[in-house]
Amino acid sequence: MGEAGAAEEACRHMGTKEEFVKVRKKDLERLTTEVMQIRDFLPRILNGEVLESFQKLKIVEKNLERKEQELEQLKMDCEHFKARLETVQADNIREKKEKLALRQQLNEAKQQLLQQAEYCTEMGAAACTLLWGVSSSEEVVKAILGGDKALKFFSITGQTMESFVKSLDGDVQELDSDESQFVFALAGIVTNVAAIACGREFLVNSSRVLLDTILQLLGDLKPGQCTKLKVLMLMSLYNVSINLKGLKYISESPGFIPLLWWLLSDPDAEVCLHVLRLVQSVVLEPEVFSKSASEFRSSLPLQRILAMSKSRNPRLQTAAQELLEDLRTLEHNV
């Protein structure tokens, strides 16, 4: 027991024995100084880094908070726009339904209007054809002119003829429809009215716009196009030319002489026949011819008229020969 206790005591003293290192005093002082400096500066450095990290953390937290707010705002905006989109889509669907309903109503209205227009055209064609037939009577013409709708009738006549010619769109074929019959009947009525002295006087004094329209339409129609209407309009002008005032008005219209020569190029013999008659009206009236003699002679399509004087169409041949004879007489008198 005694030996064991002594050994244990010896071991305890050995474990607690201090160890020493030999260091030069100078090194110890330098080490001591450095330790003091570290002890002095380390808290400052650590405190600065911690503070900086803390500030950065604050900034990050603020940014995160702002981002969260922005995200929340974006969510609210998204919900708002989604609601607006749904509203717009609903409005769009409603508008489409309304437009579809309106389109159906418009189509129905167009169909009704078309039916009414067809009915009016049929009625106009029938009524004007009947009036065309009876207007060959002087008494009927006087009755027409004596009414308070005569001016309106001839104004509408000119407008209707003009619209019809514009609608042809280059078609050179004769049209066989209620619309064309309506227009032909109107032109025929004008021709018959102009065939009566009081009718010519009325047209020259009160319906010059109609005469201007006829001259314009004769220039608008191409050679071979709608010859029946051309013939009726030329007959109207010829009848008006029987009236000296009417002949003066027509012949003084701008481009009248070139129009006559252009119309003579039409392939239809009936058109050329009535052009020659109108030319003859100008030639046989000295007061009128003297004003356009220079232009007349310088542009006269003599070869075309000579060819017509040898035509197989007896009426065209006779008219051309008479015009050539009248021209020779004029040259002889000059």
UniProtKB/Swiss-Prot annotation:
Annotated effect of mutating residue 200 to T: Abolishes interaction with BRCA2
Record keywords: Chromosome, Coiled coil, Cytoplasm, Disease variant, Premature ovarian failure, Ubl conjugation
Post-translational modification: Sumoylated by UBE2I in response to MEKK1-mediated stimuli.
Reported effect, residue 167 to L: In POF19; in mice this mutation leads to a decreased protein stability with reduced fertility due to a lower frequency of crossovers in meiocytes
Expression tissues: Testis specific. Overexpressed in some tumors.
Gene3D superfamilies membership: Leucine-rich Repeat Variant
Segments forming a coiled coil: 49-122
One GO BP annotation of this record: female meiosis I
GO terms for cellular component: chromosome; cytosol; nucleoplasm
Function: Meiotic recombination factor component of recombination bridges involved in meiotic double-strand break repair. Modulates the localization of recombinases DMC1:RAD51 to meiotic double-strand break (DSB) sites through the interaction with BRCA2 and its recruitment during meiotic recombination. Indispensable for the DSB repair, homologous synapsis, and crossover formation that are needed for progression past metaphase I, is essential for spermatogenesis and male fertility. Required for proper recombinase recruitment in female meiosis.
Subunit architecture: Associates with HSF2. The interaction seems to occur between the trimerization domain of HSF2 and the N-terminal hydrophilic region of HSF2BP. Interacts (via C-terminus) with BNC1. Interacts (via N-terminus) with BRCA2 and BRME1; the interactions are direct and allow the formation of a ternary complex. The complex BRME1:HSF2BP:BRCA2 interacts with SPATA22, MEIOB and RAD51.
UniProt disease annotation: Premature ovarian failure 19: A form of premature ovarian failure, an ovarian disorder defined as the cessation of ovarian function under the age of 40 years. It is characterized by oligomenorrhea or amenorrhea, in the presence of elevated levels of serum gonadotropins and low estradiol. POF19 is an autosomal recessive form characterized by irregular menstrual cycles and cessation of menstruation in the third decade of life.
Protein name, UniProt field: Heat shock factor 2-binding protein
Native organism: Homo sapiens (Human)
Phylogenetic classification of the source organism: Eukaryota, Metazoa, Chordata, Craniata, Vertebrata
Gene: HSF2BP
